[in-house]
Amino acid sequence: MLNALSLAASPESFLWWRWRDRFLSAGDPAALRTHLLVERWTLDEYAMPSALFADVVALYREDRFMRGTLRIEGQTAAPSNVTMPVLAVVDPDSDVVPPSSVIPFLDALPDRNWILLHYEGDTGIALRHVGVLAGRNAHRILWPEILAWIRYAR
């Protein structure tokens, strides 16, 4: 169900981009292997209980976290209550998690203890928003920065 809803929400990201990536990966065995592994991973989806699905949809629609109206165990969850350092990675071309949805969160944090990294994409990742986890460029460029930040932020 989640795959179908994702496709309906963004055919560019969940259909056309993955076919483009498959084509571009065809001549590179390592890229094609990663592409196929990500595709296989997408097939591991379990049915989400309907009550959980309704809650998730409400969270997205109402944007309660950003509005400061999300309550968890009697506590308000909001950017203004985040006290830990934050590292965010954005893909400038993503319509799944666009920078315009991440940057307002960072700007709403109570202090400037955050860093924003940019992921410029890869071939062989099937789904662009998964690239920061599976892509070769992400492993070569981003992850050393992320791990260094984690060591420093402690």
Please provide the spans of the model-predicted regions.
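Alpha/beta-hydrolase-fold enzymes
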Residues: 1-51
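Terminal low-complexity/disordered tails
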Residues: 93, 98-102, 143, 147-148
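Active-site nucleophile elbow and catalytic-triad environment of alpha/beta-hydrolase enzymes
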Residues: 56-78
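Short beta-strand/loop motif that positions the catalytic acidic residue
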Residues: 82, 88-90, 94
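C-terminal catalytic-base region of ester-bond hydrolases, centering on the histidine
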Residues: 55, 67, 92-93, 106-107, ...
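Catalytic active-site module of serine/aspartate enzymes centered on a nucleophile-bearing elbow/loop
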Residues: 112-154
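Short alpha-helix in the alpha/beta-hydrolase fold that links the catalytic acid
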Residues: 84, 98-108
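Hydrophobic alpha-helical scaffolding
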Residues: 43-47, 92-95, 136
